[in-house]
Amino acid sequence: QAPQAIVKAGISRTFQNIRLFMNMRVLENVLVGTHINTEYSFLDALFRTPKWKRIEAEKTKRAIQILKSIGLEYRMHDYAKNLPYGEQRKLEIARAIATGAKLLLLDEPAAGMNNSESEDLLNFIRTLKNKGYTVLLIEHDMSVVMNISDRIYVIDYGKQIAEGLPKDVATNPRVVEAYLGGVANNAVS
């Protein structure tokens, strides 16, 4: 399906590698997410009609609210390239939220993060969950997976080898063998 059809279905995603517009400001990056659902014509934008001005003001207000909700409002005028890595990840998720999605697909959001950034990300994802978002997480950092997931599906070479609650998956012999090389004692802490 076309990307706009997926977004209209309420689904948005982030990628393992950060895909921000690094030479644009934080606010502008979030605004990009709002433009998938534009309600004005090309001519409205070209001539900056009252309709265009009203809708753009609403989108800007919404983008600022999203930045407030994730703690990046104070960075709205900074360039994305100047944000620390963890904040760039948050910004990418904020842009996904700006599309209006309720299902967020996060591909390796903790990749490249230190422990402090990973913990901050976990808290952020919990906040999203509490706000009614559904998060589908693809992640190899087992501490992140075990600390954030309600339910886990484990895939090994394209085949599902386990599913269940974190405590059950952590002790599943097939999971231990596939992801931890057969070291079963205290496999996931």
Model-inferred region functions:
Residues 1-189:
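Glycine-rich phosphate-binding loops of nucleotide-dependent enzymes
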